[in-house]
């Protein structure tokens, strides 16, 4: 597996900022370019005394729901410094890959402080999470404001993205501190007539995967199929889901963005192959298997939605000298005027 950090040379645009940790991140775009309420704006106070200022979701048009989910995820990835977690060489059928022992990720202290209120903002979108923030405040007071988060925040990240994308109604998306809550909602929606759930659950390979969909795995238990989870619906489980950003058929890989991926918001690259139906589907990797495909019930978008996103357009067309090999081909990207969604 490869964890990559890309560095950017700053030219004339102030939407990039250099952190003390020497990684460059892209500030969130002005609202007139992309109208997203920053997660940090939902928080009051400093590490050790943070509290929620906003808990609900504002009303956002869902006309371009799939595109907005993708664009919102990409903007957060940019704010966290364009970190990449490449797992393509860890596919289980790679004879040259040897699984490495797990090591706790190390986050730069200055960077941890910079994004603390953003992660707290993700938590604010989930119900019954006040105790988590209070626990974190206690940890910060004891260990310092740059100490790691005590609770995994990947489900909070997904919940905030959906909240900010217009899925504030719990009947549409069950925002939660744990992924299994909205996985179960998507499972039940498939068997429920007239369900208004934004996602419907399928086994991986059963349906075409598109940008804006969710792909999920289980670690405790290690679910292999959707039926295994269906038999335990409502029971707590340690699961993880990421948001699909791009299907790369030429290189047989799927690009996703998730929270708390190695303690950060990262772009994850998974190995893939074509199914018998001709779909590009993820293959087992690093001893893991995805068991659920949560398909978004929304209009399709072009597969180039990644390159066309406001954050990537700002990177490619904003006058920067950048280095992002193997992810974006700048020669194939057209600079277009972005309209606020």
Region annotations inferred by a language model:
Residues 25-170, 314-341:
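N-terminal capping segments
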Residues 1-6:
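Positively charged n-region of N-terminal signal peptides that target proteins for export
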Residues 85-88, 172-174, 227-228, 267-269:
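Short, solvent-exposed loop/turn and secondary-structure capping segments
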Residues 7-15:
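Bacterial N-terminal signal peptides
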